[in-house]
């Protein structure tokens, strides 16, 4: 059937890492979601610290940050030639904001955006017809601070995600304990300075002081959003409706006060949520989701390698892969679809300082 043919299509795993330009900072593997096996295909050198990336919908372009401090920070456009199994750098542009740590494509794929951690800003890049980054960019800067005297002295933009209805952009700000919300308009024509995001109608959602908002994900039913907070180690559950997030629940993912929570994802069937914790008791907290109410119940945890900054769940929900930065490895866990619990398959991929995993087809 056509459906099973789609599933037979090659599944690629893209890996971003902390790397010098002399190393292959981005690598591509084949991943077989039927058996959890992977095979290295290709890589690309020349980018400093491509620590976060996003593929285009067709998988033929990859956009990656160059997470450096200050002026040397970049956004990078890469061509992925699946026939030749080759990655080629199309072009790079400065972000004008230090330490970009997250990158995303607008729903129409006319723009790429970076969240700049040290810059406390968001950069908007229009794309040309070949998917290259144009040089005329828009920088949106923020102000403020919060409770933690070491980590919240200024804005720290950590994640930017478009809402599933494509009408808003949510930007988590670890430094000010806020989510900035921007109405989105893809077809604005009066120059790049007004493109995509409506700054005049921006509003903010405050979370508890000292939380440290990091990554956001949406439930497949689009009714709920979940935020992992790096400093408090809590997940916040929100109901979502037309740009408005209303708090449902705060629940601990990090139970040892490590202040290093990382990433958050939901299984494709919408039944389980996973959140990673670093610095102490490195691992993944597992929650079941009440899909009517949006509430979470802690159902288990899984120890991982060191510093699980980022992880991903295969499309069929069978495998959860964890980028363990300081173990220099990607662990492959099998996921029990009934209990949500994880089991290490031992099919570990050895690679230097992996910190971002994405699938494309």
Predicted regions and their residues:
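A short beta-strand motif characteristic of beta-propeller blades
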Residues: 39-45, 88-93, 144-150, 200-206, ...
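Short loop/turn segments immediately following the C-termini of beta-strands
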Residues: 18-20, 67-69, 117, 127, ...
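Beta-rich, blade/repeat-based domains predominating
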Residues: 47-57, 96-107, 111, 143-165, ...
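An edge-strand/N-cap motif at the start of beta-rich repeat modules
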Residues: 8-32
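Short, small-residue-biased leader/transition segments that mark boundaries at the very start
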Residues: 1-7
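Short loop/turn segments immediately following beta-strands, especially the blade-tip
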Residues: 30-36, 78-85, 125-134, 183-196, ...
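Blade-loop segments of beta-propeller domains
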Residues: 40-109
